[in-house]
Design a protein with these regions (language model features):
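A ligand-binding cleft/hinge motif common to bilobed small-molecule-binding domains
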Residues: 81-100, 186-214
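Periplasmic-binding protein-like
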Residues: 105-110, 115-122, 201-245
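Transmembrane alpha-helices
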Residues: 370, 403-436, 462, 466-467, ...
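Short helix-to-coil transition segments within interhelical loops
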Residues: 384-414, 441
Length: 495
């Protein structure tokens, strides 16, 4: 029975790649406003062409989106020519879109023509700080190694990012730290850092009167916006993406970013765009908050339920083995403990390249299952080990088979500890599942990521409050289950 259940759960996960939601076209976006806006424009064009579209917002950086595209987890996402050359193809000499198209075809990927604007990297400072130090260009930073720099984590690791830039300009800055893109702007305005990396079409540059330092050595290449798509994407969908070609210049893109950040609504930016070009967008209407909450919550529940089912079915048997003395026990407890020490984002990144996983809900369920093992395994082992020798001797006198003793006597006696472990694991999983949105698995992490990107507390609470309520509901459910699953004589009574 147990083996059959495991097979069913694993089969559900494998089928899950095709059955989680089932949109005909899945779009991805990086974790910054402009990428969200561009994918929203593409989404509305695709819906106008008759496709059911899911936009997986803020999935991460270049490598995660590129892996997702290659593996078929998404059909398309917005990218930049400089990034394609430097980070994806690692062929900086590829000049034209035509050359890029030929090289990308080797990976089963196509590229649209340019959307019309260049969004290159830049370094920015507050006007007051730049004027105070007399800094106008990047080379001026060499005179001020004491300045505090806050860079996005992707920029710190890129081939066209901080390391090569530092060498090109001969900089020797003493304080360089990694920061989220949106939080970096807050740190800059609060005076916690002096310089940060930015995109030249960021609305926050004009909104906050920031100074863009001149790239006097011409380090940064052109970053012309395009869409990458899988070549097996339906022809009508590709044509819908291409309707965006040549329709966006720098000024229009900056304004779209500004609308999104001011209204906290990417659809509002898309509506303005379609009005400007004389098309009708937003074909399916704005999704209501109620509908979004239902969608996020249902996906979150699915992720938590599947991962917890796996953790229970596999964790309790492992806990039984771990309750016995010997090397196997130490190995099981050590490995489950080690998994718990791996940072959540690192575990997701490690799982993505594994065949049959990739980007999406399957990987999220596997990661959540691994994180959920330790409380269940350890509590099961502890509960069984704590059974007194007298009770064990009495069970032996009854001449029961080992399996019967385990199922009828030992596990019921250990049930309070086991259920406490399952309860702890469930609460942890509900919270950890919010990170699943970073790899396009959806759930209540979507509004949290979007809110962080927009610096909007209300949007963050749209995900945080339901997640907290879900955890409270789970706590209450387990309190009820305790009455049915724990033998009456073992239940704690108030004194």
């Amino acid at each position: 029975m147990k083996a059959r259940l495991i097979v069913v759960l694993i089969g559900t996960l494998l089928v899950g790649r095709a059955s989680f939601g089932g949109p005909s076209i899945v779009l991805g976006s990086k974790k910054f406003t402009e990428s969200f806006v561009l994918s929203e424009l593409a989404k509305q064009n695709l819906e106008g062409a008759g496709f059911d579209v899911e936009h997986r917002q803020g999935m991460g950086g270049t490598i995660i989106l590129w892996e997702a595209l290659q593996q078929g987890s998404i059909a398309a996402y917005p990218e930049y020519t400089g990034t394609i050359r430097e980070e994806i193809l690692k062929r900086p000499m590829a000049a034209s879109i035509g050359e890029l198209r030929k090289q990308l075809a080797e990976y089963g990927v196509g590229v649209t023509e340019e959307l019309g604007f260049n969004n290159t990297y830049a370094l920015v400072m507050t006007r007051a700080r730049a004027n105070q130090l007399g800094i106008q260009k990047i080379s001026d930073l060499a005179k001020h190694p004491e300045l505090r720099l806050g860079m996005t984590h992707e920029f710190l690791g890129r081939h066209d990012g901080w390391g090569p830039l530092e060498k090109r300009y001969g900089l020797h800055m003493s304080d360089v730290r990694g920061l989220d893109h949106t939080l970096g702007y807050l740190a800059l305005l609060n005076g916690e850092i002096d310089v940060k990396d930015a995109y030249t079409t960021d609305a926050k540059i004009g909104q906050n009167d920031l100074i863009v330092l001149a790239d006097d050595l011409k380090f940064f290449p052109q970053y012309r916006a395009v869409f990458l798509f899988r070549l097996d994407t339906p022809y009508r969908a590709i044509q819908a993406l291409r309707r965006l070609e040549g329709t966006l210049d720098e000024a229009r893109m900056v304004h779209l970013n500004e609308i999104a950040e001011r209204t906290k609504d990417y659809s509002a930016a898309a509506d303005w765009y379609f009005e400007q070009i004389g098309q009708v967008g937003n074909f399916n209407g704005h999704e209501s908050l109620q509908h979004r909450l239902i969608r996020w919550t249902v996906r979150h529940l699915i992720l938590v339920s599947l991962s917890m089912a796996l953790a229970i079915v596999i964790g309790i048997p492992l806990g039984i083995y771990a309750s016995k003395e010997g090397l196997a026990s130490e190995i099981i407890l050590t490995l489950t403990g080690l998994i718990q020490t791996v940072p959540s984002l690192a575990l997701l990144a490690l799982l993505v390249p594994i065949p049959f996983l990739g980007i999406g809900p399957v990987t999220a369920v596997v990661a959540l299952f691994l994180y959920g093992l330790l409380p269940i395994v350890r509590n099961t082992a502890t509960g069984l080990r704590d059974i007194s020798p007298q009770i064990r001797d009495a069970a032996s006198v009854l001449a029961l088979k080992p399996r019967t003793r385990l199922l009828k006597i030992f596990l019921p006696l250990a049930s309070p500890a086991i259920l406490a472990g399952i309860k702890t694991s469930t609460i942890i999983t509900i919270g950890s599942a919010t990170l699943a949105a970073l790899i396009g698995a959806g759930g209540l992490g979507e509004p949290i990521i979007s809110g962080l990107n927009l610096n909007d507390g209300t949007t963050i609470l749209e995900g945080a409050i339901p997640a907290a309520l879900m955890a409270i509901a789970a706590q209450g459910l387990f309190s009820i289950l305790d009455r049915f699953l724990i033998p009456r004589g073992l239940r704690l009574r108030p004194t």
